[in-house]
Amino acid sequence: MTLSPLEKTGILIEALPYIRQFYGKTVVIKYGGHAMVNCELKKAVMQDAVLMHLVGMRPVIVHGGGPEITSMLGRLGKQSQFIQGQRVTDAETMEIVEMVLVGKINKEIVANIHRYGGKAIGLCGKDGHLIEARKQVAHIQKDGEEMDLDLGYVGQVERVNPGIIETVIAEGYIPVVAPIGVGPEGESYNINADLVAGELAVALQADKLVLLTDVEGILADRDDPASLISSLEVGRVPELIQQGVIAGGMIPKVNCCIRALEGGVKKTHIIDGRIPHSILLEVFTDTGVGTMVVPG
């Protein structure tokens, strides 16, 4: 679709109050899903982050990388095992996870931001003890009894020390964070990227937390894209979970939004990362995209 000059002008005018409103504000973006695989979507996300930075916003990117980790493990002859959606991570697997997330994906994102006119610095939770972590244990039921399963080097966020992020932003760079935490003995932990993004947003007291997903948002009817719930009050969440409207992998994402709101983040969004420039559409247009989770 080709826009006329008048239509392009209208888009810029619509964005103007939002550019003014969010000048100097922090937006934490969880980058994952199809947007990390498709070349055009990769380009769009990088361009979105660069534009936000150039108009005075403070974007912070937290990225995942599950598919690339699984691919690398397969190439090295290691099978991936998951329990409750968490990758069982022994010491050797943790080395591979860290190599892929920190050494490969993180640096590719940094390079692409520079390619499209921005400046970025790649970090992980071990840098400046940004993300202090503790071991996570899976609680399961077997034969009617509750059991704890050791997931290896899978972690939970214990504490976020955002000083290094603030320093990077103050120097004019976009921080790009890999979701690796550091334990009390200096050991590495693999942490869910949504959780890292949420806790980082709280520590930075971000104005927005934006989670990119592979769905339109939260749908009242999962078979009907037109049933998108554009704004969801936290008080409705238990009922929607009970009804099965919020289910599967969407539950931890919604819980992440709730935790962020409780911690002082002003707005949280679950948006469709398969739409080019969905971040800009959410931030700079009247209608936005996806589902906004709000207090209430």
From Swiss-Prot:
Keywords: Amino-acid biosynthesis, Arginine biosynthesis, ATP-binding, Cytoplasm, Kinase, Nucleotide-binding, Transferase. One of its GO terms (cellular component) is cytoplasm. InterPro entries: AceGlu_kinase-like_sf, AcgluKinase_fam, ArgB, Asp/Glu/Uridylate_kinase, Glu/AcGlu_kinase, NAGK-C. Disulfide bonds: none annotated. Its main location: cytoplasm. It is an enzyme of class 2 (transferase). The record marks K30, K253 as: Transition state stabilizer. Its EC number is 2.7.2.8. Gene3D superfamilies: Acetylglutamate kinase-like. Catalyzes the ATP-dependent phosphorylation of N-acetyl-L-glutamate. Belongs to the acetylglutamate kinase family. ArgB subfamily. PANTHER family: N-ACETYLGLUTAMATE SYNTHASE, N-ACETYLGLUTAMATE SYNTHASE, MITOCHONDRIAL. This is Acetylglutamate kinase.
